[in-house]
A protein has these predicted regions:
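Conserved, well-structured core segments that form or line functional sites
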Residues: 1-128, 134-137, 142-229
Length: 229
């Protein structure tokens, strides 16, 4: 079931996204895979927030933030890492929720393979693994093998997706999905409630200098996959 709360302000939508799932379909080395992850950490942004990409109005870069709710806004951070936001609020008002961390549920070893490939800097998963119906040109498995030689210690499970760039690398989210409708493959957002006993924490956002004290970061407390703030 697609979340019906995304027409709300980002500060309403961001905590409600916690527990929702992202399902990504890819083809890697000729085999189709389904990657499923549960959102455990988000940050809220909108056009009235000086820390937001939407601040100052629409542009070629941030146009998706002003588009329909339930679509994807993807950008590159520090020239290296893709980050993704779920667009919210009615079309015309720039708003979105950064997906800051997810908990892997299905396809964990494929996510690990993609993340390990990225660690050696050659196979940037978001560019080199195609969507469903297309094959992988990057041989990410070979790159992962190289990564294993370079690093003695493989990635710990909790480190696979505990940051916005890691999320996009593990789920193969890049600019090809800019503006993507999250009701459709190859990346689908589904509503799911919090598990019994789970509670939501709130804090300032991570790594920003403007409006830095605003409590716009939301996370599932005690979840091992929440990023280190």
């Amino acid at each position: 079931m697609f979340p019906d709360f995304l027409e709300n302000p980002s500060d309403v939508a961001a905590p409600l996204l916690l527990g929702c799932t992202l399902t990504r379909t890819i083809t890697l080395n000729g085999e189709k895979h389904k990657l499923v992850a549960r959102i455990v950490e988000t940050e809220a942004y909108d056009q009235d927030d000086p820390a937001s990409h939407a601040f100052g109005g629409p542009s070629d870069r941030n146009a998706a933030m002003f588009g329909p709710a339930g679509h994807l806004y993807v950008y590159v951070s520090y020239g290296m890492h893709h980050c993704c936001n779920v667009v919210c609020e009615p079309e015309g008002f720039g708003s979105g929720c950064l997906v800051r961390a997810v908990e892997p549920l299905e396809g964990v070893e494929v996510m690990r393979e993609l993340r390990e490939a990225g660690r050696v800097g050659k196979a940037k998963a978001g560019h080199e693994v195609a969507s469903a119906g297309h094959d992988c040109e990057a041989q990410a498995g070979h790159e992962a093998e190289q990564a294993g030689r370079v690093r003695k210690h493989p990635l710990k499970l909790r480190d696979l997706t505990n940051g916005p760039g890691k999320v996009c690398a593990a789920l193969v989210i890049d600019k090809e999905l800019y503006g993507h409708d999250l009701t459709a493959e190859p990346l689908v957002l589904d509503y799911a409630p919090l598990l019994p006993g789970e509670t939501i924490g709130r804090s300032p956002r991570v790594g920003i200098s403007k409006n830095a004290d605003a409590l716009k970061r939301y996370f599932i407390e005690e979840n091992a996959f929440v990023s280190r703030a």
